[in-house]
């Protein structure tokens, strides 16, 4: 199956660290983004928000009122994502462990006892997600948790990671009971799908509590088909050039495996990052389908402003480019949800017959029409044909940290204005970027809906088709098709920018009547 539509805010920039704590530090980070006018949509809470690393709890000292934290983030145009790991602290006075034990839902050892393994809270028990009763129990835990105003959920260390075993995960002879259409079996049989079964259960629990909204779940472990339940990131990378470069083929491979929303921790998670590394990373990482900055405990601050003015300015440019392209990313998310096409694509997708493109791991495509060449790329193999360099933000082509962007001949890319977060209106105005092919023609489309909820399934969306054609000394751009009963803010009005050898030529008007751009 394909990935269902995610909420639009999840295509914005995310800021995380292990950990923002206490609650006032979370709000301070949010306020700094707004003060510095660096676009951002979500702040992430790692395990320090919990009471002694007990899942589904809040630290009474650092986060005495999580509902107020979420309210204050929402007032600033942010969404929040909070971590939930699989391991529950072995503590007879802790409600999750107590109810899990009473319901007998834990994974068992080979001799039939509850398996306890060392995790963040110390000794922990682990739900058996093959067992229907365990899933029902797990799903019910989300009711009170989401009632605090939590937006997204982060299921981490769900391989599962166990610190006191030789293989750093469950013993292979642990027992999963199965049920429904899953047979009983040893952990060696179920290891690769433990995280997958966890996020499936989490999604079902979130949907039961909040059926009117689209869930957003991020997972570290997943499996083929898991895109139906969660986005997948590349895990605990390090602040080093090898991991920066490796993130491109890793994200591409996730996309080719059916998981369209993926990315690496921008700046690197482990170890300290320096300014040059971070600037280079966000310069192309802003184009990951899932774009999030993250940092490990004990490492330096890695927010966009943490490395001085030059990197702060470079980060702002990179993220402004991302937000201008939001209508294009959202259209590609819709495509992924309908036919499974990845958002981030290998360059050989543009010309499968050109075997020289097959091994390219530095440059990549966003959709069919946008070529991204990271600043670190040395002699990347690029597709032939018309690809014109594109500038979206003042200074973006002169900044040494920014990836080069090229638009494909024959394409029309929908873009919006610079916004600080997705609660603001993108399409006021809509700008269409046009690059003609050898025949003087171009086409493109835009998908738009409410950004959350399921009304698009009942026709509340707008899927618009655009064409451009050169006639004599002008290019005429038109809206040539529209499906769905939804309206977009621009009401058929648009700015058109035709990218030519002479530079960018502009015009504006009504797309139904046709917009003429004089050459």
Pin down the residues of each PLM region.
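Solvent-exposed, conformationally flexible loop/turn segments
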Residues: 398-402, 510-519
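Accessory, solvent-exposed terminal regions and/or long lumenal/extracellular loops of proteins
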Residues: 410-511, 519
